């Protein structure tokens, strides 16, 4: 388990994973979220790590499904057919 606390207290992120597992669960709490979370808000997403980030990005760009990019963090998001965001991560 890892935990990240914002210096200003605005969020807490907790990462959970089995010791021998390949999967990680990220739980985020936002202090200033105005109401109870509603699943329809799309305040959750899945993230996928790829061995060939550049090729994945090129394919997703060609498909026109990239909805948000954060070059400073080295990540981007695509949308699935239902409009949910999927995070694409480079190798560690």
What feature does the model see in each segment?
Residues 1-22:
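Core segments of cupin and vicinal oxygen chelate
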Residues 33-35:
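Short beta-strand/turn micro-motifs at beta-sheet edges
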Residues 1-4, 28, 70:
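Solvent-exposed beta-strand sheet faces enriched in polar/charged residues
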Residues 19, 39-85, 91:
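Vicinal oxygen chelate
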